[in-house]
Amino acid sequence: CVRNYLMDMLKLEKWEKPSVKEYGSVDEILDEIVDFAVEKEIIPQSNAWRDLFDTRIMGVFTGMPHEVNAKFKEKYAKSPEAATDWYYAYSEDTNYVRKGRIAKDIRWKYDSEYGQLDITINRSKPEKDPRDIAAARNAVKVSYPACQLCMENTGFAGTLTHPARQNLRPIPMTIHGDKWGFQYSPYGYYNEHCIVFNSEHIPMKIDAEVFGKLFDITDMLPHYFVGSQAPLPIARGSFLL
């Protein structure tokens, strides 16, 4: 089934059993496949198109949302840490967490008068390709999903102005009686950087109720630290762990 999906994506009409080749990472495999797609003019050569295509490929290998959620619950029955260990590894294996790109970040520690600081220079996000910028300028504006932290991103094919999410599988959570989602960041700034977001696209603010929500999250995931960036003008309502 997976083979046939990939053959369809790559416009292949026949298949021959290949010789076994070892790769060092999923990035090497995807780069080779995407290079083939560019060579055969299946997609244009640009950073955005390459990301759209490699995410589409990994979506084929990603379990259905109910399967991923069931596995998380199974692990959670052992311990919250076992559940997040599994989910983070799964997010790396399906390339939602871009492990290879995150490794490019420059990190170091600095002993300041206020304590030890972790400093990061983010080099993991690819540079904007001029071809993508020009194409996005002329692209039809759409409002679905409403933002990059909406539950509707699950399985979304993506556009030149909105990243593909075929390999995204958020874990449903109930926080303060409302439905929320839990996922890792594709480009984490720190270890197991994750996000908890409201299932509804609504503005958030810092008030007394927020602290109750933060405590709910730490009750469910006691080995994580959580904070809120809700009032920041460039950030939609979410909690960072």
Regions found by a protein language model. Give the residues of each.
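Histidine-centered divalent-metal-coordination microenvironment in nucleic-acid enzymes
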Residues: H193, N198, S228-L241
